Curated annotation (Swiss-Prot):
InterPro entries: Ig-like_dom_sf (IPR036179), Ig-like_fold (IPR013783), Ig_V-set (IPR013106), TCR_beta_variable (IPR050413). Residues 1-21 form the signal peptide. It comes from the Eukaryota. Most probably, the alpha-beta TR is not assembled due to incorrect folding of the beta chain. Alpha-beta TR is a heterodimer composed of an alpha and beta chain; disulfide-linked. The alpha-beta TR is associated with the transmembrane signaling CD3 coreceptor proteins to form the TR-CD3 (TcR or TCR). The assembly of alpha-beta TR heterodimers with CD3 occurs in the endoplasmic reticulum where a single alpha-beta TR heterodimer associates with one CD3D-CD3E heterodimer, one CD3G-CD3E heterodimer and one CD247 homodimer forming a stable octameric structure. It comes from Homo sapiens. This is Probable non-functional T cell receptor beta variable 7-3. Pfam families: V-set. Probable non-functional open reading frame (ORF) of V region of the variable domain of T cell receptor (TR) beta chain. Non-functional ORF generally cannot participate in the synthesis of a productive T cell receptor (TR) chain due to altered V-(D)-J or switch recombination and/or splicing site (at mRNA level) and/or conserved amino acid change (protein level). Alpha-beta T cell receptors are antigen specific receptors which are essential to the immune response and are present on the cell surface of T lymphocytes.
Length: 115
């Protein structure tokens, strides 16, 4: 049962669903210099109202950053407040901005959406 749960959780984080549609990310990867600003965009699955951002550093599990329900942030308790900003102004596309990147920001930034 543990393996099934792990596979299900991985599919949810990747935004997979039974129709083959998924959460899209722009850009798919980004390399930048220390001190530069980065902007990541998430387009959720059509009709999904909830959107989640996670960060996964090398060798670590996913770390929750922020959760949106519609246009508002329902829980931003994991989002570092000094240089990280996330918005979802129209209840669809969300943008995560990281200002003045640092070495510790190097990670996979994951998005998920749900009904």
């Amino acid at each position: 049962m543990g393996t099934r749960l792990l596979c299900w959780a991985a599919l949810c984080l990747l935004g997979a669903d039974h129709t083959g549609a998924g959460v899209s990310q722009t850009p798919s990867n980004k390399v930048t210099e220390k001190g530069k600003d980065v902007e990541l965009r998430c387009d959720p699955i059509s009709g999904h109202t909830a959107l989640y951002w996670y960060r996964q550093s090398l060798g670590q599990g996913p770390e929750f950053l922020i959760y949106f329900q519609g246009t508002g942030a329902a829980d931003d308790s994991g989002l570092p407040k000094d240089r990280f900003f996330a918005v979802r102004p129209e209840g669809s596309v969300s943008t995560l901005k990281i200002q003045r990147t640092e070495q510790g920001d190097s990670a996979a930034y994951l998005r998920a959406s749900s009904l």
